[in-house]
């Protein structure tokens, strides 16, 4: 009976665990939908800023913003690493950290040192374990990231590039593909290339360049501000995609945990039933044996 009592305890324990993972799955599903909405809402802003900046760059070809000038001579490279603050989201963080480590080795092979910015506690811990130089970080963004919280950490990287201290700035995050698929990506954030400003309309034509703005105070000041806002929007978009990926990965991970818990419960229930059947059979045998002896 002690064995049966122990099995009942295990079944109860796994059932309680399954209740927790099921609840976490439902919470993650709800947060995932909101994260996807934020991700989609961020895209039009970045697209519009890009279109305006592209038009102004074409209208004022004599001016080149520092973000569009190459710093090949710099001995360092910057990277903004976007991860989650929490775990229990499958291999999502592991994948983007592995990709980042490969990028670090590639840059170090080119003789570059790393100037890193961490967004998320998992990435910050990873960089600290590597003893990498962390020039800025922001953690505990919560479920609703605000651009104001990101600007300070991102500005450090933008200033490093503007001052010619880094040859390029890379952005590492997890791109949201769909609910079941998220992929780690590392994109070059700076210098900005002309290709980034080329966006085709739905009919395949490029946006019209026949009109112009009235600039206040002047075109250069507006371009300077626009390009900073554009880069900030790209980082915010990456953070929004990373959060949508996090909730999707967590929902899938918790569903898998719930399914596995159900399988374990069924197996334990089968063992319990067999033990109970064996105990009953033994008692019956003892009763029959006692009756025969009398």
Swiss-Prot record:
PROSITE patterns: ATPASE_GAMMA (PS00153)
Listed NCBIfam families: ATPsyn_F1gamma, PRK05621.1-1
Membrane association type: Peripheral membrane protein
Protein purpose: Produces ATP from ADP in the presence of a proton gradient across the membrane. The gamma chain is believed to be important in regulating ATPase activity and the flow of protons through the CF(0) complex.
Protein name in UniProt: ATP synthase gamma chain
Family matches, as CDD domains: F1-ATPase_gamma (cd12151)
Cell compartments where the protein resides: Cell inner membrane
Family matches, as SUPFAM superfamilies: ATP synthase (F1-ATPase), gamma subunit
One GO cellular component term: proton-transporting ATP synthase complex
Keyword Ion transport recorded: yes
Similarity-based family: Belongs to the ATPase gamma chain family.
Organism in which the protein naturally occurs: Paraburkholderia phytofirmans (strain DSM 17436 / LMG 22146 / PsJN) (Burkholderia phytofirmans)
Quaternary data: F-type ATPases have 2 components, CF(1) - the catalytic core - and CF(0) - the membrane proton channel. CF(1) has five subunits: alpha(3), beta(3), gamma(1), delta(1), epsilon(1). CF(0) has three main subunits: a, b and c.
Gene: atpG
Keyword Ribonucleoprotein among UniProt keywords: no
One annotated GO molecular function: ATP binding
Organism ancestry: Bacteria, Pseudomonadati, Pseudomonadota, Betaproteobacteria, Burkholderiales
Gene Ontology biological-process annotations: proton motive force-driven plasma membrane ATP synthesis
InterPro entries associated with the record: ATP_synth_F1_ATPase_gsu (IPR035968), ATP_synth_F1_gsu (IPR000131), ATP_synth_F1_gsu_CS (IPR023632)
Main location: membrane
Keywords (A to Z) from UniProt: ATP synthesis, Cell inner membrane, Cell membrane, CF(1), Hydrogen ion transport, Ion transport, Membrane, Transport
């Amino acid at each position: 009976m002690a064995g049966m009592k122990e099995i009942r305890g295990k079944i109860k324990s796994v059932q309680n665990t399954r209740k927790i993972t099921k609840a976490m799955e439902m919470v993650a599903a709800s947060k995932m939908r909101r994260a996807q909405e934020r991700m989609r809402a961020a895209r039009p802003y970045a697209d519009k800023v890009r279109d305006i900046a592209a038009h102004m760059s074409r209208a004022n070809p004599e001016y080149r913003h520092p973000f569009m000038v190459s710093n090949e001579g710099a001995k360092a490279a910057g990277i903004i690493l976007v991860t989650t603050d929490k775990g229990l989201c499958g291999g999502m963080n592991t994948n983007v950290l592995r990709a980042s480590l490969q990028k670090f080795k590639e840059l170090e092979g080119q003789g570059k040192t790393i100037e890193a910015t961490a967004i998320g506690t998992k990435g910050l811990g990873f960089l600290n374990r590597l003893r990498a130089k962390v020039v800025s970080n922001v953690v505990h963004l919560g479920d609703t990231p605000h651009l104001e919280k990101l600007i300070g950490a991102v500005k450090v990287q933008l200033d490093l590039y503007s001052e010619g201290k880094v040859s390029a700035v890379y952005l590492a995050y997890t791109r949201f593909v769909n609910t079941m698929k998220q992929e780690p990506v590392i994109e070059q954030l700076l210098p900005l290339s002309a290709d980034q400003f080329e966006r085709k309309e739905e009919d395949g034509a490029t946006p019209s360049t026949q009109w112009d703005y009235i600039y206040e105070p002047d075109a250069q000041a507006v371009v300077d501000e626009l390009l900073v806002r554009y880069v900030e929007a790209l980082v915010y978009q990456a953070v929004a995609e990373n959060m949508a990926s996090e909730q999707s990965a967590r929902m899938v991970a918790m569903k898998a945990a719930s399914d596995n818990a159900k399988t374990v419960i069924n197996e334990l229930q089968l063992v319990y039933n067999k033990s109970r059947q064996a105990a009953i059979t033994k008692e019956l045998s003892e009763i029959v044996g006692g009756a025969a002896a009398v």
